[in-house]
Amino acid sequence: MPIILENISVFYSRNTPLEISALKDVNLRIEKGEFVGILGEKGAGKSTLIKLFNGLLRPDSGRITVNGLDPSSKKVKSRVGMVFQQPADQLFCRTVYEEIAFGPLNFGYSRKETEERVFEALEAASLERSMLSRDPLSLSGGEMQRVALAGALALRPDYLVLDEPITGLDPAGKKEILETLKKIKGQGTTIITVTHNLKGFFPLLERIVLIKEGRISFQGSRKEYMETENVPLPPVASMMRELHSRGIQVNPAVFTVEEALKEILRVKSMIEKEKAEKERAEKQTKK
């Protein structure tokens, strides 16, 4: 079942001179299995929105349901995995194992069941078992992000909610997170990610929700977003589209910009080589 928001409004410092309207009359429906990107500038209301999904924040008006239930219910909280923008802010246990096990133990699962979930989540997040005894805060930024992700996955969530999961990571860390999310999406998990920059996520998203000043100004597919918002294709995407129009399929894996350029240059070199061979063959035929 979906997440449904109806006429949601959220205020900070309500009924004071400092009152701020963070969300205004938001209506949104997220279906099971979707990969949704929530896009907007800093302060637009993105992070406020996702805090509603598992009851971290209550709306001042309107109604939200997750699988038909109130998001503050224990059943919903156990099915919604959250990963925050700064992984260090949610990593507080002494070891990676304890960190990943925290959620299942907190929701009453046995130690045996919890151990199974820890190893399952570890693999899903592409982490090595040798890391289980390490201090989470001693890890690299990308590794900490994946530990936080594993902690969310240990709940076997129906919904995975991510707040700027690749912000601040180096290219290798970003690639690891994106490839992990692609794998998780293939298992049928609903993924909702907040971002101020679609770079990296764009090939994975099935729907984009654009928030401006607390209101949803657009929601639709990637194609609709680019047409409606007049988004120019970056050079790499333009080149890939040109190759596809010629019937040339480029490896659809999640690329870094450098990898995409290498792939495109490889294919273009192949085209030029075939063209040269064809011209030589035609010249020999004429002789």
Curated annotation (Swiss-Prot):
ATP binds at residues 40-47. Pfam families: ABC_tran. Belongs to the ABC transporter superfamily. The keyword Translocase applies. Keywords: ATP-binding, Cell membrane, Membrane, Nucleotide-binding, Translocase, Transport. It is a peripheral membrane protein. One of its GO terms (cellular component) is ATP-binding cassette (ABC) transporter complex. Probably part of an ABC transporter complex. Responsible for energy coupling to the transport system. It is an enzyme of class 7 (translocase). InterPro entries: AAA+_ATPase, ABC_transporter-like_ATP-bd, ABC_transporter-like_CS, ABC_transpr_CbiO/EcfA_su, ECF_ABC_transporter_ATP-bd, P-loop_NTPase. This is Putative ABC transporter ATP-binding protein MM_1038. Its main location: membrane. Disulfide bonds: none annotated. Gene3D superfamilies: P-loop containing nucleotide triphosphate hydrolases (3.40.50.300). Residues 5-238 form the ABC transporter domain. Its EC number is 7.-.-.-. GO terms for molecular function: ATP binding; ATP hydrolysis activity; ATPase-coupled transmembrane transporter activity. PANTHER family: ENERGY-COUPLING FACTOR TRANSPORTER ATP-BINDING PROTEIN ECFA1 (PTHR43553:SF24), HEAVY METAL TRANSPORTER (PTHR43553). It is found in: Cell membrane.
